[in-house]
């Protein structure tokens, strides 16, 4: 079986209507043949909407986002690098929806019906706190 682990980071403020701009993508594929990795920062559509969290995530080196390749180019590379996998693994449903929509916007379909959401899996095993969240990030 071939697994594709995807991690996204996105820039979003509470008042933003949508999920925000993806500014970092990291993918790792595990199969019996070995492991493949790909990770990149992406250029933000609106650099003026940068949040403090995003600045902290890039260690206040904003030039990495200003000079990064466009999101479409990064996602096209991901589609070429990881053309087939059996199981897609992400942290949360929000992250899955954001990745699915971003890939769809670039003309790519996710090639699996098997999706594992670690937050939901962990929530089923670990007793959540009062607000229904797992006690760590």
Predicted regions mapped to residue ranges:
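Short alpha-helix plus adjacent loop in nuclease-associated cores
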Residues: 116-135
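Substrate-recognition/cap helix-loop segment adjacent to the acidic, metal-dependent catalytic center
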Residues: 94-115
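Short coil/loop linkers at secondary-structure junctions
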Residues: 60-63, 109-111, 125
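Conserved non-catalytic scaffold segment of RNase H-like nuclease domains
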Residues: 2-96, 102
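Generic secondary-structure boundary/loop-capping signal
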Residues: 19, 62, 112, 118-119
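Alpha-helix capping at helix-to-loop junctions
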Residues: 80, 87, 104-108, 124-127
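Internal, well-ordered alpha-helical segments in soluble enzyme and binding-protein domains
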Residues: 74, 135-137
């Amino acid at each position: 079986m071939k697994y594709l682990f995807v991690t996204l980071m996105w820039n979003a403020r509470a008042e933003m209507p949508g999920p925000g701009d993806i500014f970092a993508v990291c993918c790792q594929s595990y199969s019996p043949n070995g492991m493949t990795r790909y990770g990149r920062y992406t250029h933000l559509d609106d650099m003026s909407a940068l949040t403090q969290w995003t600045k902290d995530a890039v260690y206040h080196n904003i030039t990495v986002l200003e000079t990064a390749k466009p999101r479409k180019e990064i996602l096209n590379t991901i589609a070429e690098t990881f053309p087939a996998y059996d199981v897609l693994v992400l942290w949360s449903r929000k992250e899955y929806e954001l990745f699915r929509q971003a890939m769809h916007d670039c003309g790519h379909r996710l090639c699996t019906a098997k999706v594992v959401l670690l937050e939901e899996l962990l929530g089923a095993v670990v007793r959540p706190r009062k607000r229904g969240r797992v006690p760590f990030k």
